[in-house]
């Protein structure tokens, strides 16, 4: 089932979808990490 993920995630790493790779968005990645940290703390 891991193969279909490759089709959904292009190798170009689109800047419009930073969450796709969990990064590549710069500031957005930091915000996303903060959300993850908050969830882990709870």
UniProtKB/Swiss-Prot annotation:
Q: Name one GO cellular component term.
A: extracellular region
Instruction: Please indicate if the UniProt record lists Glycoprotein as a keyword.
Output: no
Annotated region (Disordered) at 1-31
Query: Is Secreted tagged as a keyword?
Result: yes
Q: What inducers act on this gene?
A: By bacterial infection.
| Compartments it resides in | Secreted
Question: What additional remark is attached to this entry?
Answer: At least four isoforms with masses ranging from 8886.5 kDa to 9029.0 kDa seem to exist.
Query: What name goes with this protein?
Result: Diptericin
Origin organism is Calliphora vicina
């Amino acid at each position: 089932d891991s193969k279909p993920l490759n089709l959904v995630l292009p190798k170009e790493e689109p800047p419009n979808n930073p969450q796709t790779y969990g990064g590549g968005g710069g500031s957005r990645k930091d915000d996303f990490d903060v959300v993850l940290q908050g969830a882990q703390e709870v």
